[in-house]
Amino acid sequence: MVMTRRIFFSWFIVICSLWLSSFSSVHAKLKGTISSADFNPIPIAITDFVSNDSIGLKIAAVVTADLERSGLFLPLDKASFFEKISNPNSQPHFFHWQKIRAQGLVTGQVIRENDGRLRVDFRLWDVFGHQQLKGRRFYTATERWRRVAHMIADEIYSEMTGESGYFDTRIVFIDETGPQNARIKRLAIMDQDGANLIYISDGSELVLTPRFSPKRQEITYMAYERNQPPHVYLQQIEMGQRELIGTFKNMTIAPRFSSDGQKVIMSLLQNNGSANLYTMDLRTRMMTRLTTTSAIDTSASYSPDGTQIVFSSDRSGKPQIYTMNADGSNLQRISANEGSYSTPIWSPRGDYIAFTKQLEGQFSIGVMRPDGKGERILTTGFHNEGPTWAPNGRVLMFFRKNPGMGPKIYTIDITGRNERQLPTPNDASDPAWSPLLNMQ
């Protein structure tokens, strides 16, 4: 039995520019300085947004939490502020903020319109350049205030680092409860900070490997019901509609969307025990075989431009990482060091491939360039697995099992800094990161 609850998300938000200055000294100074592991976070002062109720405090708190969690910003203690912002539309006294060494200053206000909507204004100031960097006005329904806060954090992140933000996103994952020998696994989705958790399935079937479309708020995943062959589904997140795209006699492994969202690539177990890669066209349902081998080919992922595929295969004796053209030609092994490699996934920027590596009883999350060079291990532990990229290619998410404990979800910066556990109500595994919601 599958939960039939429909999930509605109305994302309609109107955005206007308040005022945007020309190129600034802060942006010039900060861009290009955040790639090293010894980077010092940017000091930033985020004031409470002026409002007649608590909504302004809440929005400022979410913006602060987003930026602090990125590891690239150091939100300053409000107790240190010399100036109280009562009119966010006027220019601040920059010398007050220079005293506490803030490089950026965020001010804002929230007004309830006569039609019930919220009007949220924010401004980002260059403290030492004495000018405004960014100004935006948002109109939205009251219940969408958290999403507006994430969008503001994205604007600040982008302006002060030169990279795209990733806060206006969601995570789909497997929620796990119950004893280890009778685990209940439910499909769940939440905001990237752990808020707004919703269960998509009820635990009556085994669900595995949820993956987001790179183009839509849509996921694909596997489901196993008792005494039934494996099913592969598409699920529309906004409307809660689920569509069966395939029922397979043998085991199906790790379905994932192509870069244009028009196909799903998956590994199908053969009668001889091997597993080969296939694609399914989502419009015609036609299957195309890409690999023919007596080995196990699995965990395929497309390059951002859709021309190449990376996957894991044990055709050389133990699991290694291979790339090939999207039609299956030009096969190349790219992993060359000791250990077994699995779960490769291409960065949205195309510059790295993330992977899981097993060596000497430890599981690591690492990255390498698409030609296999420049391998770097970001974190190592008892059991780390299943990396997934933020849409800006800056942050990785994965799940970890510690001895005697259930799995939890973690994030880490591509430099290996800023490893953090993501709050979930229960054990959680197999996360997948959505594209930016405001790009849908």
Swiss-Prot record:
Gene Ontology annotations of biological process type: cell division; protein import
Gene Ontology, cellular component aspect: periplasmic space
Cross-referenced Pfam families: PD40, TolB_N
Origin: domain of life: Bacteria
Protein's cellular compartments: Periplasm
Keywords on record: Cell cycle, Cell division, Periplasm, Signal
Residues annotated as signal peptide: 1-28
Subunit structure: The Tol-Pal system is composed of five core proteins: the inner membrane proteins TolA, TolQ and TolR, the periplasmic protein TolB and the outer membrane protein Pal. They form a network linking the inner and outer membranes and the peptidoglycan layer.
Known role: Part of the Tol-Pal system, which plays a role in outer membrane invagination during cell division and is important for maintaining outer membrane integrity.
Annotated NCBIfam families: propeller_TolB
Family per record: Belongs to the TolB family.
Protein name: Tol-Pal system protein TolB
Organism of provenance: Bartonella quintana (strain Toulouse)
